[in-house]
């Protein structure tokens, strides 16, 4: 894929700060990362609903959903996984510029890729949420039957089984989805957002 040298960035006359002021809250990416089955999608759905009910401008980007459209041409090789996250990072940045609290739920197994998204954003605009859950518990849950398929060899390069997952070392938030309820996890994240004056 060739890159064009003949493109120009066109600034909007409406700034991010103006959008945030109108919304009554800051914008940021709330980036859920964790193994398949750890609760990323479940908790992120509940968080988005809670933020929406509180009158916040919010939108959720989910790993499976994005692969139905924007990233449907990508597989699960290390290179494709990285490109998947790079594209999502660019979309998330646009949504932050639009003033939204952008909730994302992606396995995003590689630390370098997550840090690449962080680097796209301004300071304090990337909130990493680690959905901590043992692979044993995730496999026990197996809501999509993916671990079973991975064990049988039907799914190669499956994170946590036949492909690596690099857990965050210093996430802004860690939720223990093996022991805490969905409601407890959402309360923990909302508390963080309020304490750090995002909302």
UniProtKB/Swiss-Prot annotation:
GO terms for biological process: hydrogen sulfide biosynthetic process; sulfate assimilation. The keyword Phosphoprotein applies. Its EC number is 2.7.1.25. Pathway: Sulfur metabolism; hydrogen sulfide biosynthesis; sulfite from sulfate: step 2/3. Pfam families: APS_kinase (PF01583). It is an enzyme of class 2 (transferase). The keyword Transport does not apply. Keywords: ATP-binding, Kinase, Nucleotide-binding, Phosphoprotein, Transferase. Residues 1-22 are annotated as: Disordered. ATP binds at residues 34-41. It catalyses: adenosine 5'-phosphosulfate + ATP = 3'-phosphoadenylyl sulfate + ADP + H(+). GO terms for molecular function: adenylylsulfate kinase activity; ATP binding. The active site is at residue 108. Catalyzes the synthesis of activated sulfate. Belongs to the APS kinase family. This is Adenylyl-sulfate kinase. It comes from Staphylococcus epidermidis (strain ATCC 35984 / DSM 28319 / BCRC 17069 / CCUG 31568 / BM 3577 / RP62A). The lineage of its organism: Bacteria, Bacillati, Bacillota, Bacilli, Bacillales. The gene is cysC.
């Amino acid at each position: 894929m060739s890159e064009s040298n003949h493109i120009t960035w066109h600034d909007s006359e409406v700034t991010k700060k103006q959008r945030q002021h109108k919304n009554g809250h800051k914008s940021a990416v709330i980036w859920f990362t964790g193994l398949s089955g750890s609760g990323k999608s479940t908790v992120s759905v509940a968080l988005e609903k809670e933020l929406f009910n509180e009158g916040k401008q919010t939108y959720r980007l989910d790993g499976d959903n994005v692969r139905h459209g924007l990233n449907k041409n990508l597989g699960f090789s290390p290179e494709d996984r990285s490109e998947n996250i790079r594209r999502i990072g660019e979309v998330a940045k646009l949504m932050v510029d639009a003033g939204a609290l952008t909730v994302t739920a992606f396995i995003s197994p590689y630390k370098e890729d997550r840090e690449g998204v962080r680097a796209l954003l301004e300071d304090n605009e990337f909130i990493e949420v680690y959905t901590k859950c043992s692979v044993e518990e995730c496999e026990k849950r197996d809501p999509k039957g993916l671990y079973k398929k991975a064990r049988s060899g039907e799914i190669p390069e499956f994170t946590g089984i036949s492909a690596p997952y690099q857990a965050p070392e210093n996430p802004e938030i860690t939720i223990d989805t093996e022991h805490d309820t969905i409601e407890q996890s959402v309360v923990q994240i909302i508390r963080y957002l309020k304490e750090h004056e995002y909302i």
